[in-house]
Structures are given as structure tokens and as C-alpha cells.
Amino acid sequence: MKNIIRLAIAYIRYYKKQAAALLMGVVLSAALFTGIGSLFQSGRMAALENARLEYGDWHYNTRGDFSSEEEFIKKLQGKGYEVEKYGLETVRKAIEEPYNIQFVYADKGYLDMMGRKLKKGKYPEKENEIAMDSYTLKNLGVEEKTGEQVALDGEIFTLSGILTEMPEKLPKQQGDFMQVFVNSTLDYGKNGTFLYLKFAEDGNVYKQVTAFANNFGIKVRNFTRNNGLSSYVGAEAPADILETIKTGLKYKEAGFPYIWEQLNGNGTLTDKVILAALALFSAFVIYSLFQISVSKRMSQYSVMPVSYTHLRAHETG
């Protein structure tokens, strides 16, 4: 082993230019691959953070039909999953006039996930108090000022607070509606509670929601995923990918463009293809440099027997 190492060092010293060229090719290829990979990773993280703002910082939601919130909190971390953040939204009532509006009570976790922060005033503390964002106030023709009276569905509420807008693209997933926030004690007997979950993103999110569902005896199909974030955090079911490919191959009018569009969520597949192409290119460059070096050595070695023959002939002549 030592002899091999010595031979390699001697070779590098003797053929400095070729060794330097090969080393430079390896370094430049590695630098190119690493640089592009880092660039893609930075872009991906920036896109993920932007998606959190546009869709909300959650992975799945489901009906929050738990016996008690205290019991649920005890199981935030279990075998195969870790709930990093959760929020509860209770829809007290929904009306269609003058607009599609939901009367909602939400806990701090939900408000945080949706980026709902108080700009003015306070969250409703009484049954006749209400809070909403500037967009909803504008549509209802109410002045953006706490203490204003708001008439909705035959009731009069006092505007206690003004919040920031809901995530811009949330209605694309849940329907076109506006929210007004009410006190926890206001009850119309039509409550629907929804649990929003964000799992630890250092692990596969789909596997975590599966483990979570099994732990609480909930069917995975009863969970609705946040499509805006799913491709970034691994929240898509493997069956979805296979089904997409089958559909694309089954229907000629769909074909490869359909498969690519469905699987290339947020451009992640494009990034992987480009990185794979760069890896192949880097390997080709290194291989080419190595082949050139080997070819030169082979040509030199082939001259040696001829030179030796001429030398012997000269000596005997």
C-alpha cells in the first residue's frame, strides 16, 4: 500500500501539468455543482417562506373532533411524528349576504399560522364585539375605526379590532370567503371546529401525518393538505405520483406535459433535473481529462520499446 502511494506521489510530481489540469477539472466541477446546488437551495427556501405568507404556515387540516384539547396537547409528539405548531378554528356561522362571510372564533395558534395580527384595537372579548381585516371592512362599507357599528345578518356588532389580511392564496384552496372574528362565547349551535397542523419539517411530513392519524384513530383521507407548501416539505402521498404517471400514460391528450406539470410543483423537479445534468457534465469533464492523461501515457509507453530496439541495434552495429 505504501509503495502504491509513493508511486502515485512520484507520478504527480513528474507529470505536474497533467495532474494539475486533472485536479483543476475536479475542483471546478465540484465548485460548479456545489454553487448551483446552493443557489437552488437558497431559491427553494425563499420560495417556501413566500408560500407560507401566501397560503399560511400549516401543512394539513382536519375536523377537530377531539374529546378534549388537553388530551390532544399531551400527544403533540408521538411515535413517528412531531407537531411543531397547531391552531384551532371554530366556524360559528356562515352567511351568503351581503357576501360569503364566516363568523369565526380562532385561537392564537390559528391566527399565528395565518399571519393574522392585530393592527388596531383588540380581539373580541364580548359577544357583541367583532374584529376583521381592512378588505372586509371596505366591502361592508364600514370605516376603518374601532368602535364602529357593524350590521351583519340582522345583528349589530361593535368593531373591537382590525387585523391584517388573510393569506392571499388561501381562498384558492378553501373557497372565496371573508372572515369576521367573534368571541369564544358566541354560539349559534352550528359550530364546526377545524384543526390546523404544522409538523417538524426536518422529517417527511406525509409520513408524520400518517403516524399522527393512526395515533388518534383518524383516516388519512380526512386530512386536507396545504397544496401551496406540500411539494416543499414532502406532504404529498406517494400514491399521488404514481396516479399522476398512470393518468398521463393512459390519456394521450395528457401525456408527458401533464405528468411534468403535475410533478413539477413549484419547480422542484426542474431543479433536480438541472442538478442531475450538471452532475453528468462534471463527470464527463473529469473523465475526459483522465482519458487525455491516460492516452498521453500510453503513447509514451509505446515509444519506449521502439527506442530500446534502436539503441540495441546501434550498440551491436
Language-model region placement:
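Membrane transport/envelope proteins' first extracytoplasmic loop
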Residues: 5-283
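Single conserved hydrophobic/aromatic residue that forms the stacking wall/gate
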Residues: 310-313, 317
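Conserved catalytic-core segments centered on acid/base and nucleophilic motifs
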Residues: 11, 283, 303-305, 312
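Transmembrane helix boundary and interhelical loop/hinge segments in multi-pass membrane proteins
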Residues: 43, 289-303, 307
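Charged catalytic carboxylate motif
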Residues: 4, 309
